[in-house]
């Protein structure tokens, strides 16, 4: 498998959603329920849900979030545990940054548990800077959130 054979693209259909839910279940103590994603997918003008697709159509990771006032607010970026440590999280992030820039969005925002060193390293390595913190934002366990952002360069859509 080469980087060229891996794609980041919009979620397509129930099979992709099943894969996203499986990644959620493998990654988080409290995964997001199917009904939430089903509702969000009814708002394509606002909701962003992109998948990291390996050859053979296997979904190995995803990113979800919302467009708001020229920003992309990321709620989740996750790679299935079987595929971690291979650079796929960075690929998913880089492709999403490029997509958001082509869409004319100005910033990407997100928050991360203070103890999530791997995620903080990923985002800081991609040019995100800390702009704040949210005290006791997370529960189970209670923990602060680090708020990060990255400004996006304008990159017009091809053919626009």
What annotation goes with each model-predicted range?
Residues 2-84, 90-99, 103, 151-159:
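Acetyl-CoA-dependent GNAT
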Residues 89, 93, 115-119, 136-141:
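Short glycine/proline-centered loop/turn elements that form peptide/ligand docking sites
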Residues 100-111, 122, 134:
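Conserved GNAT acetyl-CoA-binding A-motif
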């Amino acid at each position: 498998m080469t980087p060229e054979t891996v794609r980041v693209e919009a979620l397509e259909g129930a099979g992709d959603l099943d894969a996203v839910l499986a990644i959620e279940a493998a990654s988080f103590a409290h995964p997001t329920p199917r009904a939430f994603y089903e509702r969000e997918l009814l708002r394509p003008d606002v909701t962003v849900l992109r998948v990291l697709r390996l050859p053979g159509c296997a979904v190995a990771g995803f990113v979800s979030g919302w467009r708001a006032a020229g920003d992309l607010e990321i709620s989740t970026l996750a790679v299935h545990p079987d595929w971690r440590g291979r650079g796929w999280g960075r690929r998913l992030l880089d492709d999403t940054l490029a997509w958001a820039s082509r869409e004319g969005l100005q910033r990407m925002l997100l928050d991360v548990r203070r103890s999530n060193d791997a995620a903080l390293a990923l985002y800081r390595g991609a040019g995100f800077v800390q702009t704040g913190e949210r005290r006791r934002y997370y529960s189970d366990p209670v923990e602060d959130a680090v708020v990060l952002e990255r400004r996006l360069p304008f990159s017009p859509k091809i053919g626009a």
